[in-house]
Amino acid sequence: MQLLNIYNTLAREKQPFVPIEPGKVRMYVCGMTVYDYCHVGHARVMVVFDMVHRWLRAAGYEVTYVQNITDIDDKIIRRAAENGETIGELTTRFIQYMHEDAAALGVIRPDHEPRATDYVPQMLDMIGKLEAKGLAYQASDGDVNYSVRKFAGYGKLSGKSLEDLRAGERVSANDAKQDPLDFVLWKSAKASEPPESKWDSKWGAGRPGWHIECSAMSCTLLGEHFDIHGGGADLQFPHHENEIAQSEGASGKPFVNMWMHNGFVRINDEKMSKSLGNFFTIREVLKSYDAEVVRFFILRAHYRSPLNYSDAHLDDARHALTRLYTALKDSQPGGCAVDWDEPHARRFAEAMGDDFNTPIAMSVLFDLASEINRTGSTAAARQLKGLAGTLGLLERDPHTFLQGGRSDDGISPEQIETLIAARKTAKVERNFAEADRIRAQLLEAGIVLEDKPGGATEWRRA
């Protein structure tokens, strides 16, 4: 097993990772609420925790990876009504779109993708345990709420006391609650809501609150105490704080050993926001950029750092990834099994073992590319392909990548080949001015030509 230190949000420091069960890792990541297309922020969560999943496996662990799907909540009910369709029709469609986006980004499907609506009995069971322990109460409006002041550890993830939270956090005002920080476990049904959004319970018809969904699904699939829980930084409070209160309140055991949170996505140095009009779906981005470029761009930043999205940064990522593929295009590395005793691999593993430091790990890839360009080393090419593969990169044929690229270049492969043939004819006819003109025309269109021995010409997108 590779040595691994992870920044634990709960401890506010890097800590050695020691799995509860030797050689095995149980990991849960908060997934999508499926009522709309996935955006760039979702892409970061997908790719970051796919990277974590891949590295844990590469390090020799047997990983059970769970990422939930929220398929019932207020936004889903509202959107289905606006569209004139059932909740099931809406969520099934957007689950499919989510899977398509994740696959495009090279994300390995989690071992389990529980849907909230399939785990309502487990949620009701957990709520019943909380009520029996005096941690939950039914309010006058019919909702069942969690009493935060009854849980001694509330605030330990966010590092704030109840007084700090009451003073500084925006919480919903509700006269039926005993405390403004109390949160809903079971939402009482409204007459106007569709039947498919309601389940029977001893507290009356209703549906689960968002927070109880993750507690019930994670504990059901991974046990009441597991290794890693991840999600975006925006979920740290209140969602993850509330998960701890629910899960530890119900079981009386520690819930999660390591809490991981990826940083925010910023658009041109501003926070991504629909209200600012700087909100991009994954599908919009993939119209202009190859999906592997987007994955490379996300992994180029440390997962806890802010990620600044811009066309300029994506263009830089495209050029950088092109450098790596170019180094591999004339090599035949054969297999891609990594020699972990080799110096580059040791540096790569050391970086990944330091809280998944992908920027440093990726710098090792460029060192290998330089060695390949300098020496033509097949061993270096094999290391480059193998190490990059642990990040889900460089898994395609180099020529396929190099001749792909942006979909809005305005010049097709067929047009490129036609111009190359015309240039070859011009050279045979010793019309070198015309041959140079065609090369310049292609270069202006972002196409780089490389004349090979024997008269062949290869091309790639710049």
UniProtKB/Swiss-Prot annotation:
UniProt cofactor note: Binds 1 zinc ion per subunit.
Gene Ontology CC, one term: cytosol
Cofactor requirement: Zn(2+)
Location of the motif 'HIGH' region: 32-42
Reaction equations catalysed: tRNA(Cys) + L-cysteine + ATP = L-cysteinyl-tRNA(Cys) + AMP + diphosphate
Entry keyword annotation includes Metal-binding: yes
Keyword annotations from UniProtKB, A to Z: Aminoacyl-tRNA synthetase, ATP-binding, Cytoplasm, Ligase, Metal-binding, Nucleotide-binding, Protein biosynthesis, Zinc
Domain of life according to the entry: Bacteria
UniProt GO BP: cysteinyl-tRNA aminoacylation
Presence of keyword Ribosomal protein: no
Primary site of residence: cytoplasm
Sequence motif: 'KMSKS' region, positions: 271-275
Compartmental location: Cytoplasm
UniProt GO molecular function: ATP binding; cysteine-tRNA ligase activity; zinc ion binding
Binding residues annotated for ATP, in chain numbering: 274
Family annotation (SUPFAM superfamilies): Anticodon-binding domain of a subclass of class I aminoacyl-tRNA synthetases, Nucleotidylyl transferase
Enzyme Commission number(s): 6.1.1.16
InterPro entries in the record: Cys-tRNA-ligase (IPR015803), Cys-tRNA-synt_Ia_DALR (IPR015273), Cys-tRNA/MSH_ligase (IPR024909), CysS_C (IPR056411), Rossmann-like_a/b/a_fold (IPR014729), tRNA-synt_1_cat_dom (IPR032678), tRNAsynth_Ia_anticodon-bd (IPR009080)
Binding residues for Zn(2+): 30, 214, 239, 243
NCBIfam families in UniProt: cysS
Subunit structure as annotated in this protein's UniProt entry: Monomer.
Family to which this protein belongs: Belongs to the class-I aminoacyl-tRNA synthetase family.
Protein name (record): Cysteine--tRNA ligase
Lineage, opening ranks: Bacteria, Pseudomonadati, Pseudomonadota, Betaproteobacteria, Burkholderiales
